[in-house]
């Protein structure tokens, strides 16, 4: 799927690549959508992400917590980038996958908001949780990873270090002009002051 795309990939081609009969794939997953979800869950299960998340959640130091987050994002990208990319691509053409993908994004938003809420005492003065969550979402995005590592040739170590230092700079030591919306201002109307 990563090379041919979601629409062009068939169960028959997946089975041929895996060296099994198509019926084996159908018996195990039923369809491509379920196979994609199985791939996503397997990547998560086989990674260090749950351990890193638990470690970050209990880390009292805000800087160290963000370093652990950067390590977690790197781990996710190294193990799951192709699956994340396929899922996004499939969501653009398959309404059922789009609904699944929306749930993944909603879960991600909740996870990031919880992470920031737990970090709130360490946030830079004047930085509200909503803005901090938006920044964490943006900087942890798979497209930034792809641009820096795949397109610009950065090593995974360099990416992780950049992400950690960027998150620390943006969330703990806030630059001038990055405060959240003023009272009564919507998040879509944010401006730098």
PLM segments and residue spans:
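Alpha-helical transmembrane segments of polytopic integral membrane proteins
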Residues: 49, 80, 142-145
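Hydrophobic/aromatic-rich alpha-helical bundle segments in the mid-to-C-terminal region
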Residues: 119-166, 174-185, 189-193
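Residues in soluble alpha-helical coiled-coils and helical-bundle/repeat scaffolds
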Residues: 30-34, 78, 92, 106, ...
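Short helix-capping/turn signature of helix-turn-helix
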Residues: 29, 89-94, 142
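Amphipathic alpha-helical packing segments from all-alpha helical-bundle domains
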Residues: 67-88, 95-123, 130-134, 161, ...
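Amphipathic alpha-helical linker/stalk segments
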Residues: 16, 23, 37-69
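Helix-turn-helix
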Residues: 2-34, 38
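Conserved catalytic core of Hanks-type protein kinase domains
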Residues: 28, 76, 138-139
């Amino acid at each position: 799927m990563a090379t041919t795309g979601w629409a062009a990939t068939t169960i028959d081609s997946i089975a041929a690549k895996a060296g099994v009969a198509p019926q084996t794939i159908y018996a195990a997953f039923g369809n491509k959508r379920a196979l994609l979800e199985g791939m996503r869950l397997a990547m998560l299960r086989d990674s260090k992400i749950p351990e890193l998340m638990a470690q970050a959640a209990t880390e009292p130091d805000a800087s160290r917590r963000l370093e652990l987050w950067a390590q977690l994002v790197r781990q996710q990208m190294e193990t799951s980038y192709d699956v994340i990319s396929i899922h996004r691509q499939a969501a653009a053409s398959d309404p059922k996958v789009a609904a699944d993908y929306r749930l993944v994004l909603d879960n991600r938003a909740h996870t990031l908001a919880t992470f920031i809420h737990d970090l709130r005492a360490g946030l830079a003065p004047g930085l509200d949780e909503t803005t901090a969550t938006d920044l964490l979402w943006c900087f942890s995005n798979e497209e930034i990873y792809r641009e820096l590592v795949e397109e610009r040739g950065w090593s995974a170590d360099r990416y992780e270090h950049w992400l950690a230092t960027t998150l620390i700079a943006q969330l703990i030591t806030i630059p001038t002009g990055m405060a959240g919306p003023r009272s009564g201002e919507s998040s879509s109307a944010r401006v730098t002051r």
